[in-house]
């Protein structure tokens, strides 16, 4: 129902991140495999590679047996979907995974053993000390440390950290509080369909029983649909953001508090972010840093009450940042609050992965 929306919203390119010279055994026109090609992120892998001019010698579309024999479109040609097996990677240079943690844990090592470099969108390897966890705007230099697998961070972490990083570089952030407003796209195509269908049923006065989400989705919001740690009270999504922030920033001392909420929005996550720096920080300083930060676009019009919104972030590569203001609860002048929005399927997933793949060897891009 909403699958066409995935590609239709992929329109605007972000500022280019200039690749550094990196020695990798990847050909100029690599064979690229996509695992999970029929999913929401898989569709965006294809669209993102196409519009960014990513050179591909051959595309291998991999999915489960039930999708085998179907086709996907790539650069005007139909590519037949193959069933994912242990022999799928024999001739592959780069593999983009977005089929869930269990699939990644089983097949990513097989792909690496066959000679492929893996960029994995699941949480399977993110906290493995030997696996780089990369946001290219922040730590592209870590790509060269890979041993075959590079992890794509959590979408909520990416959304917050891209604009926080330039501030952290100039004035160390010692504490950050994040409250998320996460769209259906983060739970996949089936969740997006359920939001549309349940909204229609609700408007027509019909009963709708949730099949994907744990609670009614239309005109409702609820705590992120991941398991709750009975001791801390934090859900898995919140814990991921905390741990990944520290790993990506390479700062175990940074204090992170997170509350993750699922909202009835089709696509694009929003987050309220308040951070405290070691030294005093002003709104003007933050604006100046963000104005030249790669992957960031300031949307902050107080006169018109116009700030980042999901409808504007959908299809955008940049993280939108607005509501930049002093945190009045901190009289020391060390804290700033802001509101951010980003397309979860793009910068939160597919775009970030493709940016990583672009940086493997400089010669991958024309």
Question: Predicted regions span which residues?
Answer:
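Short hydrophobic/aromatic beta-strand micro-patches
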Residues: 274-276
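N-terminal Rossmann-like NAD(P) cofactor-binding subdomain of oxidoreductases
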Residues: 19-217, 253-255, 279, 288, ...
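A common structural junction motif
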Residues: 285, 290-300
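Oxyanion-binding "anion nests"
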Residues: 220-266
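Short, conserved charged micro-motifs
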Residues: 279-287, 348-349
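Conserved glycine-rich beta-strand-loop-beta hairpin in the small C-terminal domain of fold type I
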Residues: 266-272
């Amino acid at each position: 129902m909403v699958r066409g929306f995935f590609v239709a919203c992929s329109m605007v390119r972000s500022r280019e991140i200039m690749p550094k010279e990196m020695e990798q055994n990847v050909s100029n026109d690599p064979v690229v495999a996509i695992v999970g090609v029929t999913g929401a992120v898989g569709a965006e892998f294809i669209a993102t590679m196409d519009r960014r001019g990513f050179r591909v010698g051959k595309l291998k579309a991999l999915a489960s047996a039930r999708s085998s024999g179907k086709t996907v479109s790539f650069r005007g040609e139909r590519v037949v979907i193959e069933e994912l097996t242990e022999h799928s990677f024999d001739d592959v240079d780069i593999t983009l995974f977005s089929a869930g943690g269990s699939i990644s844990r089983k097949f990513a090592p097989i792909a690496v053993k066959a000679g492929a470099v893996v960029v994995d969108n699941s949480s399977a390897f993110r906290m493995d000390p030997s696996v780089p966890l990369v946001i290219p705007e922040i730590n592209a230099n870590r790509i060269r440390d890979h041993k075959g697998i590079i992890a794509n961070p959590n979408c909520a972490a990416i959304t917050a950290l891209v604009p926080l990083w330039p501030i952290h570089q100039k004035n160390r952030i010692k504490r950050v509080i994040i409250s998320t407003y996460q769209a259906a796209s983060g739970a996949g195509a089936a969740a997006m369909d359920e939001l549309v269908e349940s909204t229609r049923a609700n408007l027509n006065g019909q009963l709708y029983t949730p099949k994907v989400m744990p609670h009614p989705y239309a005109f409702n919001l609820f705590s992120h649909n991941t398991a709750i740690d009975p001791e801390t009270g934090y859900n898995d999504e919140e814990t991921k953001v905390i741990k990944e922030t520290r790993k990506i920033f390479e700062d175990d001392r940074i204090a992170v508090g997170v509350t993750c909420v699922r909202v009835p929005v089709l696509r694009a996550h929003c987050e309220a972010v308040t951070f405290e720096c070691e030294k005093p920080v002003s709104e003007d300083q933050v604006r100046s840093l963000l104005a030249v930060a790669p992957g960031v676009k300031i949307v902050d019009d107080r006169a018109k009450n116009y700030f980042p919104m999901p409808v504007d972030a959908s299809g955008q590569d940049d993280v939108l940042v607005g509501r930049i203001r002093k945190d009045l609860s901190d009289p020391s002048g060390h804290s700033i609050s802001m509101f951010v929005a980003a397309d979860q399927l793009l910068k939160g997933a597919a775009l970030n992965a493709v940016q990583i793949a672009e940086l493997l060897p400089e010669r991958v891009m024309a």
